[in-house]
Amino acid sequence: MRYDLVIFDNDGVLVDSEPISNRLLAEYLTEVGHPTSYEESIRDYMGSAMHRIHDLVLERTGERLPEGFDEVFHGRVFAAFERELKPVAGIVEVLERLVAAGVPYCVGSSGSHERIRVGHRVAGLDRFFGEGRVFSAEDVGRGKPAPDLFLYAAERMGVAPGRCVVVEDSPLGVRAGVAAGMDVLGFTAMTPAERLVGASRMYAEPGELVELLLG
């Protein structure tokens, strides 16, 4: 099927940020009294907006994260991005193929607009995502796994949900795409396929993604 809109998740799909973010999140949660391993951070928090991380910690421990947690965490993440962040291998070629084929695309991310902007600048993807192509959980009332973000992106881009495909690497994102009535392509580089239940198709390499999108 040829889609009228491709909605990319950002972290882990466009920019290789999940290892950086989850390493720092695990370290910082441990530092403030909530021991967390890298593996646990990937399992429990990958794909989450910050408010969901706060809610999960409160639910599990009965304690709130300290005031200023988000600001400190984002400062550490942005500093690490400047040193380490790269685009996901092969994604530039995917985007170039979409541009050449005239297929509309955008990004729908749990991250803040600032996080998306910094990541794209450092990774050299900002040339692909200009005005009107970037949508954040900040833009809607509920983040993933609610469908609001993807539905909002589709509405702003003028495309019916049933003509959209979502590219995701987290269980929360897959659930959001399915709830929005969209096909979902699950990226298995960091998440086992069995955790991406609901995805229409899976891919392990960006080269496979080109075939799934443009076939």
Q: What are these model-derived regions, one by one?
A:
Residues 1-4, 96, 112-215:
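Asp-based, Mg2+/Mn2+-dependent phosphohydrolase catalytic module
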Residues 2-101, 117:
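N-terminal helical cap/lid subdomain that shapes the substrate entry/recognition surface
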Residues 11, 21-23, 41, 73-76, ...:
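A generic short-segment signal for beta-strand/edge and adjacent turn/coil regions
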Residues 13, 109-111:
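Conserved phosphate-coupling serine/threonine residues in phosphotransfer and NTP-handling enzymes
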Residues 15, 43, 84, 106, ...:
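A generic secondary-structure micro-motif detector
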Residues 35, 104, 183:
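Residue-level detector of anion-binding/catalytic polar loops
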